[in-house]
Swiss-Prot record:
One of its GO terms (biological process) is protoporphyrinogen IX biosynthetic process. Signal peptide: none annotated. PROSITE patterns: PORPHOBILINOGEN_DEAM (PS00533). Tetrapolymerization of the monopyrrole PBG into the hydroxymethylbilane pre-uroporphyrinogen in several discrete steps. It comes from Bacillus subtilis (strain 168). This is Porphobilinogen deaminase. The porphobilinogen subunits are added to the dipyrromethane group. InterPro entries: HemC, Porphobilin_deaminase_cofac_BS, Porphobilin_deaminase_N, Porphobilinogen_deaminase_C, Porphobilinogen_deaminase_C_sf.
Length: 314
């Protein structure tokens, strides 16, 4: 009897595209499973008119989906790794981390003007504190204007509203089939450190589902898994959500060691903590990077930013 695996997904075009891609790959690994997609609307999808940092950070796009997993209404879910909270509900696991897409941020501007050449006070659209803080480190004169909506909506707003440029994740553009020529320039990690897990997917399931976990083990990419787990350990130790400008990105160096860079900044980009740590164990590398930065005052900064946001929200 062929097992039908119910897959939970957000409704957005990007989420559905990612989910269908994962299903296709899993069918190639083992054709003896059937798959059925169940669309789930999350809190983050329902709130469209405020910045994410004001409505409670991480987990906004996954909570309802995780509830459906716990209730056994679905068997697995495909998420963007950067939407995943650092700690999962009991009984659930990230069963699989496929190969990572491009982790960089992409700048798309009117008339293809590069960041360094933009006029003083140019208006940049982003709804990410991490991106805006790092843009302001490089160009303190820029005006940051919040922007929400899917890729198509944002590209349209760039054309019709008073934005000089917008910043999007390169991975999302690529998965949605946008050609690289829409991008004015890719921001290298040295200039704009990516969000933890940016460009990677997380496939979540119940810890007890051995059949699915066995299937997933054939689809996990070891390089991505090691590097992303270090980033997530850093995020967890820093207790950072969407509410603070926090970034973490890892690569494997020539010696096959994890090289992890973490960043915490004030929203205006005036205070920056940045450290790079090398080691073999993802959990240890992430924690050590966080501890180094906490010693220098990064943790105090996070607490202060959270307090200020709470007061703003009242």
């Amino acid at each position: 009897m062929m097992r039908t695996i119910k897959v939970g997904s957000r409704r957005s075009k990007l989420a559905m595209t990612q989910t269908k891609w994962v299903i296709q790959k899993l069918k190639e690994i083992n054709p003896s499973f059937a798959f059925e997609i169940k669309e789930i609307v999350t809190k983050g999808d329902r709130i469209v008119d405020v910045t994410l940092s004001k409505v409670g950070g991480k987990g906004l796009f996954v909570k309802e989906i995780e509830q459906a997993l716990l209730n056994e209404e679905i068997d697995m879910a495909v998420h963007s790794m950067k939407d995943m909270p650092a700690v999962l509900p009991e009984g659930l696991v990230i069963g699989c981390i496929p190969e990572r897409e491009d982790p960089r941020d992409a700048l798309i501007s009117k008339n293809r003007v590069k960041l360094s050449e933009m006029k003083k006070g140019a208006v940049i659209g982003t709804s990410s504190l991490r991106r805006s803080a790092q843009l302001l480190i490089e160009r303190p004169d820029l005006t940051i204007k919040w922007i929400r909506g899917n890729i198509d909506t944002r590209l349209q707003k760039l054309e019709t509203e008073d934005y000089d440029a917008i910043i999007l994740a390169a991975a999302g553009l690529s998965r949605m089939g946008w050609k690289q020529d829409v991008v004015t320039e890719f921001l290298e990690p040295e200039r704009c450190l990516p969000a933890v897990g940016q460009g990677a997917l997380a496939i979540e399931c119940r810890e007890s589902d051995e059949e699915l976990l066995a299937l997933f083990s054939q689809f996990t990419d070891e390089y991505t898994k090691r590097t992303v787990l270090a980033e997530r350990a850093f995020l967890n130790a820093m207790e950072g959500g969407c509410q603070v400008p926090i970034a973490g990105y890892s690569v494997l160096n020539g010696q096959d060691e994890i090289e992890m860079t973490g960043l915490v900044a004030s929203p205006d980009g005036k205070i920056i903590f940045k450290e790079t740590v090398t080691g073999n164990d993802p959990e240890e590398v992430g924690k050590r990077c966080a501890a180094l930065m906490a010693d220098k005052g990064a943790k105090d900064l996070i607490d202060r930013v959270k307090r200020e946001l709470d007061e703003d929200g009242k």
